[in-house]
């Protein structure tokens, strides 16, 4: 009994504290406030401040009572605690310009600081004070000023109440002021950039070089770094602003500025000063703020080195860059600008540098996972601990177009050894195991997933952490299912704390925890409550609040986590009087009867489970979980005890710069990094020994490891000082082949999608440098479709009926289920004006594809594939016609090709309501149809197996396409639509369809696509309908074709095809063979040297032979440049026997650049050209930076590979190329990709004036020195002149200027319908035909009242010529049928006004004649003296000036009439003479003739020749008028009775008038009916 009584007494003594603990209630004080959302704490004090409305309130007792501060007279917009003087200094910004308030005594008193006044009409939008970590008197004030602009409220109201807008944010300026006397005086640090009129925004960003008391940077206390930027926003063509920048250092408060030389020719995008590094981010392209960036690192503010990035950095979050405890740089990368608003600005990837800050790498387990939001949490008080979470973007909640079936997995992992090893967050909670949907003992498939850790604001504890999240495999994440968890071992294992998500805060180093649910109804009680724990989360007690609030924050009043007092800030919507905020002060300081812990209440807790981290073992003394006391060391920081480890291990080392970790974690050499380093610069040997490991900077282990060197091969490694040294190559190896790839055509990044031989999809956003696999939920990808109207969208079809869609270039994918139908492999058809609207074709009743019941069905979706509706049965091809036409008859019109199950014919139907109620049959029987360039063209079968084409430009009116009648065109059995651009359709009409011997005629239409003329005969095509036809991108009217030169014999099956290449510079009106270069690439003459291009010209392999149709001759951004594989000779040779040729003037002149066939690619608008051998293994490429004048070879890999393709972004504007290659390996072959980056070989970016003006780096020049007029104008193009700079994202092809419009010549016209171009250059009517009925135009345009007959010519649509030759001059107008009355009214003249004018003129003439007769003739003797008057006579009466004028008129009249009489007499005699001569000589010969349309050069000058502007022209005119008088000798002139003598049959060359151009003598011998009419002269 005694023993039992003793045990009972002991149990009672132990129980008393627990009873006290249970009975303990914290002290809670409520304050009602208005508009108070952030409470700030001064460090190591009981003082809190907050902004309430526009004033500042303060509490000196941890928030129990509040009062308004004295000394602040202005309305306040913001308050903040000085991060370097957290104990006593705070700053409040005034609503008024240039004023701030500062306190240095925890808010007891405030001093007003006044900054310099702004300029007139310039208003401050707020100022911010930055302080110095070591000197309290050093300030930097940063202010933003904008022009005051009153804006019309009706057009642009400032707010909902219509207040006027007073800031013009497009003209804003940052200003920085410095003070070294505590704010008593300020001086401006003025930007060293001059602001011009185009600068919309000027930015000045300055900061002290010292960023902390422990800063390791070599700098003085007065060192200030400033970044000045000017941004110009005036050009619509640019997707982003032009930026110029300067990064400078000042040590004398801005009096003098020293620019960092390394960044003089670069665009500095931002900078960040850290503890031991300064990081500078430079923008790769000043004209594209989405371009890739470079990272530069320095530890002394003078020497910067470019860091190695494993991917393109395009959207860094510069304000989030920080250093961890090891000195590694943590670089978050934000996502690009998304179409989804909620995705903008989120962290998409995190890169971590080595301890030197020069080599970055991603978190290993996130590198090849699905792309998503990444969060990294590193509690500073837990050395070596990192918690990272990956959350797939495709699973973002409430996304537009969110689809079902998405299974992309997120994951959260933890590392306690600085990221060397990672593990999932294990849930070890047997008591709650049944509450989870998965087996928590299966850690890999059932772990804690969270998303909300942040780097800032974590309270130090001894390994006690809380978070919200869910437990699962990461495939499902619903915010509503979150719960709250707690850990006591630094995050390695977790237990459930609450079944709902909570806000939480810890105090007393983790011994006191407060949690409040986000939603008060979580416990089925509408009133709010908070929970608290005094045993590190083991048990929880509820405290009921009397008001329902929405918690905004809960915080410990001591930022270091040592105190036991908390603030709960929340708001309610129930009060209508404006008192919406409730502030609760919660005090736990008297818990456990105010007992303070003693030594035996503590235990040691070891970080990282006692392992060495950074060469040190860390431990913390913490209170035992069940101890009945509080630590109560208020304002003391948590102590971390460390013990250096004796031996260094591999965990204390990192890979040297030249090495990377392989899949096993071993450091192996990397060729690309070796090229970037300088290890091979120091030796002439083939190999150099390098240690693969280096000790982590700052590691404290005592005894280093012995690291053996590894021999690195230096063969082929470029030496320092060469351009090749700066080329960066990234190699990726695969155990599969890439079968498909395609870039997204945007300037945002270099994203491309790839499909391998296994049907797996991969995405890259950096031109192939890094590649991620697309999660397709285990489905094989069987087809990929890109949206041609929205460049960021693509659709992947899965083998199990899923469709994976992306609208952000593969950053995220959404999954939907296709309709229950068999996939037929038909492409999607898209709406050009609605991104989420498209048509999918599936097979219905298709158990077998050969089943008679199997038929296609068109399914329509308007929500990006989330839902489908059946639109039309038996449809096999549809078009959203209403979205394609410029002027559609109905914008909702859809056209579909329908093939009924029971019929072999196809029909064309249309609808304006997606075939719900409206269905119109357009054609009963068609072969097919297609859309191109605003036209829809339908092929309709005709009798005798012929085809007819019908064209529409509005979807309602169809017109038959009239093909030219030609002697070599038989049946219209096949045609190919080649292109439609600027109002014309190019079409190839087959004239021979024997397989392997195919060819046909090239045709071109008029503006509405209905009337075609022949441009060229016997143009080559293949059996599949592809044609050797290519329009040169970016230039008007230049086309290359291959013709079958022996077409007659090929058609008769006597010979194989012999191809020749032809070029036109005026859109097909005239064709010529390509001029061959004089010498080959080795300087030797070509074997064929005939001056006749028909026998010796350049020939190129064309479209019909390409492996990839995207490999075009030209590039739209590299104007005038073309590559081709061909030969010089009489015709085209086989591909393997050909060379590679290049031109820079649009095809006028060519040069051989390689002796063998090569693949080519353009970069930087032609500023970088790359060639790689085709069909042969290689380890090198050739590149040129001077537009092909010189070429350099570069070894891009160690082993030779067979390059399958070379590619870059579709706009050919990037400096990065991607090679696909295959290399032979042991046991087979491996597929490889090589990303080759040329950015660094250029010294700088070219200086470009965004208004298009010439500069030092750009000049306007014609395409070639021989270029004159093309399409009626002379054009100059803006071109780069300095090969040492790169162009970047400038749409250079859009900067051209027309010098002048030229006079019209023969080259500005083409033959009209039913006319053909004869060998003499004239357009002649096809034999046996009449001109097209010109009156047909009246039927097409009912409003017309007149029409004109065709002249046989029509002006080329692209021509802008003015004046000159008018070959298309219309005839006299004719009245349209039925419009005779309107026609007569248009051209008739009213009799009344006409009679009045006519009579008035007659009266004036009569009066003038009478006056002259009276004063000049009658007074001087009348007509009797008329014959006696002579010029200069003085016998006439002249009494005044009027008499003199009248007499002069009389004398002049007499002179004129006398000469006219003589001339008439002379003419009469000559006519009689000629008639007599003709009668006697008629039949002997015809007279000489003059032909007008023989030679272009003659015609170009004909207008001037016949205009009488110069002496030679007048001679020619006289020559034509007196055609029978030339070359007649004097003694041959007969009398009337004499017989005519003969004259020579041909004129000699000396008799040709001087005005004729040389070589055109044959054109002057027949002045017949073909001479141009006066209106053409």
Curated annotation (Swiss-Prot):
Lumenal topological domain: 22-1391
GO cellular component terms given for this protein: cytosol; Golgi apparatus; membrane
Record: glycosylation sites: 121, 168, 445, 791, 1008, 1301
Gene Ontology BP term (one): protein targeting to vacuole
Membrane-crossing residue ranges in chain numbering: 1392-1412
A Pfam family this chain is assigned to: Sortilin_C
Annotated signal peptide: 1-21
Bilayer topology: Single-pass type I membrane protein
SUPFAM superfamilies reported in the protein's UniProt record: Oligoxyloglucan reducing end-specific cellobiohydrolase (SSF110296), Sialidases (SSF50939)
Compartment(s) where it occurs, according to its Swiss-Prot or TrEMBL record: Golgi apparatus, trans-Golgi network membrane; Prevacuolar compartment membrane
Residue numbers on the Cytoplasmic membrane side: 1413-1577
Family: Belongs to the VPS10-related sortilin family.
PANTHER family named among the record's database cross-references: SORTILIN RELATED, SORTILIN-RELATED RECEPTOR
Entry protein name: Vacuolar protein sorting/targeting protein PEP1
Natural source organism: Saccharomyces cerevisiae (strain Lalvin EC1118 / Prise de mousse)
Encoding gene (name): PEP1
């Amino acid at each position: 009994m005694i023993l039992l009584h003793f045990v009972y007494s002991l149990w009672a003594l132990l129980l008393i504290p627990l009873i006290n603990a249970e009975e303990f209630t914290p002290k809670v004080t409520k304050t009602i406030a208005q508009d108070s959302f952030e409470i700030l704490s001064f460090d190591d004090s009981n003082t809190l401040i907050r902004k309430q409305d526009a004033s500042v309130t303060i509490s000196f007792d941890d928030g129990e009572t509040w009062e308004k501060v004295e000394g602040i007279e202005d309305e306040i917009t913001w308050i903040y605690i000085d991060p370097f003087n957290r104990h006593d200094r705070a700053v409040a910004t005034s609503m008024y310009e240039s004023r701030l308030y500062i306190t240095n005594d925890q808010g007891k008193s405030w001093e007003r600081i006044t900054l310099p006044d702004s300029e007139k009409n310039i208003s401050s939008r707020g100022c911010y004070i930055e302080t110095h970590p070591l000197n309290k008197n050093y300030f930097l004030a940063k202010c933003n000023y904008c022009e005051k602009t009153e804006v019309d409220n009706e057009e642009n109201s400032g707010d909902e109440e219509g207040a006027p807008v007073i800031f013009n944010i497009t003209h804003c300026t940052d200003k920085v002021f410095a003070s070294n006397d505590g704010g008593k005086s300020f001086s401006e640090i003025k930007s060293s950039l001059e602001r011009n009129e185009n600068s919309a925004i000027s930015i000045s960003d300055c900061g002290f070089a010292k960023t902390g008391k422990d800063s390791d940077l070599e700098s003085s206390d007065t060192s200030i770094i400033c970044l000045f930027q000017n941004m110009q926003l005036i050009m619509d063509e640019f997707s982003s602003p032009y930026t110029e920048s300067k990064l400078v250092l000042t040590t004398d408060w801005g009096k003098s500025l020293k620019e960092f030389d390394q960044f003089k020719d670069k665009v500095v995008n931002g900078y960040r000063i850290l503890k031991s590094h300064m990081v500078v981010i430079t923008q790769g392209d000043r004209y594209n703020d989405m371009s890739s960036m470079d990272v530069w690192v320095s530890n002394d503010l003078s020497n910067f080195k470019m860091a190695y990035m494993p991917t393109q950095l395009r959207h860094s979050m510069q304000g989030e860059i920080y250093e961890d405890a090891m000195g590694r740089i943590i670089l978050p990368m934000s996502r690009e600008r998304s179409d989804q608003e909620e995705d903008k600005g989120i962290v998409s990837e995190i890169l971590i540098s080595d301890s030197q800050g020069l080599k970055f790498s991603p978190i290993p387990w996130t590198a090849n996972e699905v792309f998503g939001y990444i969060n990294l949490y590193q509690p500073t008080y837990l050395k070596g601990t990192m918690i990272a979470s990956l959350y797939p973007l495709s699973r973002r909640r409430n996304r537009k177009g969110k689809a079902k079936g998405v299974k992309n997995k997120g994951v959260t992992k933890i590392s306690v050894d600085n990221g060397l090893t990672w593990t999932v967050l294990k849930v070890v909670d047997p008591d709650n195991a049944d509450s989870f949907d998965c087996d928590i003992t299966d850690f890999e498939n059932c772990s804690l997933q969270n998303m909300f850790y942040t780097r800032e604001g974590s309270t130090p504890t001894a390994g006690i952490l809380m978070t919200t999240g869910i437990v699962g495999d990461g495939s499902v994440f619903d915010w509503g299912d979150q719960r709250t968890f707690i850990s006591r071992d630094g995050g390695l294992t977790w237990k459930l704390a609450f079944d709902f998500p909570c806000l939480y805060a810890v105090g007393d180093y983790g011994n006191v925890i407060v949690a409040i649910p986000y939603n008060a109804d979580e416990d089925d009680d509408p009133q709010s409550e908070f929970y608290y724990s005094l045993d590190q989360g083991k048990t929880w007690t509820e405290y009921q609040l009397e008001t329902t609030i929405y918690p905004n924050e809960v915080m410990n009043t001591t930022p270091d986590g040592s105190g036991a007092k908390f603030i709960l800030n929340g708001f309610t919507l129930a009060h209508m009087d404006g008192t919406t905020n409730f502030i609760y002060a919660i005090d736990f300081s008297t818990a456990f009867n105010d007992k303070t812990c003693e030594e035996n209440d503590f235990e040691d807790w070891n970080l990282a489970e006692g392992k060495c981290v950074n060469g040190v073992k860390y431990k913390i003394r913490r209170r035992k979980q069940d101890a009945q006391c509080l630590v109560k060391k208020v304002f003391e920081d948590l102590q971390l005890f460390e013990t250096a480890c004796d031996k260094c291990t591999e965990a204390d080392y990192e890979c040297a710069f030249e090495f990377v970790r392989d899949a096993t974690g071993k450091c192996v050499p990397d060729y690309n990094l070796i090229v970037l380093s300088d290890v091979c610069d120091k030796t002439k040997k083939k190999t150099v020994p390098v240690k693969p490991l280096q000790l982590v900077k700052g590691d404290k282990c005592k005894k280093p490891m012995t690291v053996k060197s590894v021999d690195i091969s230096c063969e082929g490694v470029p030496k320092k000082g060469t351009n090749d040294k700066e080329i960066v190559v990234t190699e990726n190896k695969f155990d599969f082949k890439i079968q498909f790839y395609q870039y997204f055509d945007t300037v945002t990044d270099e994203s491309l999608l790839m499909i391998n031989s296994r049907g797996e999809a991969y995405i890259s956003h950096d031109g192939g440098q890094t590649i991620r696999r697309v999660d397709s939920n285990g489905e094989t990808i069987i087809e990929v479709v890109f949206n041609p109207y929205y460049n960021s969208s693509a659709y992947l079809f899965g083998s199990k009926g899923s469709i994976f869609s992306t609208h952000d270039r593969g950053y995220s994918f959404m999954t939907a289920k296709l309709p229950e139908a068999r996939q037929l492999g038909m492409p999607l058809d898209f709406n050009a004006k609605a991104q989420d609207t498209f048509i999918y074709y599936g097979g219905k009743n298709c158990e077998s594809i050969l089943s008679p019941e199997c038929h296609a069905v068109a399914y329509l979706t308007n929500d990006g594939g989330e839902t489908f509706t059946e639109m039309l049965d038996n449809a096999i091809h549809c078009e959203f016609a209403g979205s394609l036409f410029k002027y559609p008859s109905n914008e909702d019109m859809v056209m579909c090709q329908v093939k009924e199950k029971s019929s072999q014919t196809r029909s064309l139907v249309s609808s304006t309501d997606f075939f719900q109620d409206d269905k119109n049959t357009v054609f009963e029987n068609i072969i097919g149809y297609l859309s191109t360039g605003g036209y829809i063209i339908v092929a309709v079968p005709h009798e005798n197996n012929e085809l007819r084409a019908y064209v529409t430009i509005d979807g309602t009116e169809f017109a038959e396409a009239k093909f030219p009648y030609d002697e070599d065109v038989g049946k219209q059995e096949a045609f190919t639509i080649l292109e439609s651009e600027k109002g014309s359709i190019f079409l190839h009409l087959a004239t021979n369809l024997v397989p392997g011997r195919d060819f046909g005629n090239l045709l071109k239409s008029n503006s509405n696509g209905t009337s075609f003329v022949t441009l060229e005969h016997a143009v080559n095509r293949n059996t599949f309908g592809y044609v050797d036809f290519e329009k040169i991108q970016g230039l008007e009217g230049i086309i290359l074709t291959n013709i079958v030169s022996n077409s007659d014999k090929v058609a008769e099956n006597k010979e194989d095809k012999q191809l020749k290449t032809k070029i036109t510079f005026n859109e097909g009106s005239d064709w010529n063979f390509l001029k061959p270069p004089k010498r080959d690439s080795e300087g030797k003459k070509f074997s064929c040297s005939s001056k006749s291009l028909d026998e010796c010209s350049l020939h190129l392999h064309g479209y019909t032979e390409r492996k990839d149709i995207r490999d075009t001759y030209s590039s739209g951004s590299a104007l005038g440049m073309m590559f081709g594989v061909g030969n010089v000779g009489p015709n085209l040779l086989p591909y393997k026997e050909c060379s590679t040729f290049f031109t820079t003037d649009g095809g006028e002149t060519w040069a051989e650049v390689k002796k063998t066939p090569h693949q080519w690619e353009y970069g930087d608008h032609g500023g970088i050209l790359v060639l790689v051998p085709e069909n042969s293994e290689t380890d090198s490429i050739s590149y040129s930076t001077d537009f092909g004048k010189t070429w350099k070879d570069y070894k891009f890999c160690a082993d030779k590979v067979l390059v399958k393709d070379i590619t870059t972004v579709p706009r050919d504007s990037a400096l990065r190329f991607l090679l696909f290659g295959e290399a032979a390996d042991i046991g087979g072959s491996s597929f490889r990709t090589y990303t080759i980056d040329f950015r660094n070989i250029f010294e700088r970016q070219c200086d470009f004036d965004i208004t298009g003006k010439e500069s030092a780096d750009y000049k306007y020049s014609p395409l070639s020195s021989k270029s004159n007029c093309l399409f009626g104008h002379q054009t100059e193009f803006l071109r780069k002149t300095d090969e040492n700079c790169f162009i970047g994202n400038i749409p250079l092809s859009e900067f051209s200027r027309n010098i002048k419009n030229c006079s019209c010549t023969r080259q500005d016209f083409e033959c009209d319908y039913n006319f053909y171009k004869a060998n003499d250059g004239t357009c002649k009517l096809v034999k046996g035909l009449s001109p097209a009925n010109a009156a047909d135009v009246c039927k097409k345009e009912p409003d017309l009242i007149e029409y004109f007959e065709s002249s046989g010519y029509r002006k080329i649509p692209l021509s802008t010529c003015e004046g000159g030759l008018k070959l298309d001059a219309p005839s006299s107008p004719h009245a349209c049928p039925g419009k005779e009355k309107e026609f007569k009214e248009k051209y008739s003249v009213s009799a009344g006004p006409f009679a009045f004018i006519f009579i008035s003129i007659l009266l004036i003439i009569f009066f003038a004649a009478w006056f002259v007769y009276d004063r000049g003739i009658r007074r001087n003797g009348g007509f009797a003296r008329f014959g006696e008057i002579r010029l200069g006579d003085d016998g006439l009466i002249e009494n005044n000036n009027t008499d003199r004028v009248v007499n002069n008129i009389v004398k002049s009249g007499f002179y004129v009439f006398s000469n006219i009489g003589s001339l008439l007499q002379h003419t009469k005699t000559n006519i009689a003479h000629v008639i007599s001569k003709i009668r006697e000589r008629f039949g002997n010969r015809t007279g000489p003739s003059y032909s007008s349309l023989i030679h272009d050069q003659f015609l170009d000058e004909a207008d001037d020749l016949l205009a009488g502007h110069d002496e030679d022209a007048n001679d020619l005119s006289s020559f034509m008028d007196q055609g029978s008088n030339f070359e007649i000798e004097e003694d041959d002139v007969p009398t009337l009775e004499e017989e005519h003598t003969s004259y020579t049959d041909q004129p000699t060359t000396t008799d040709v008038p001087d005005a004729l151009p040389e070589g055109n003598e044959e054109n002057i011998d027949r002045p017949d009916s073909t001479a141009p009419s006066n209106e053409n002269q």
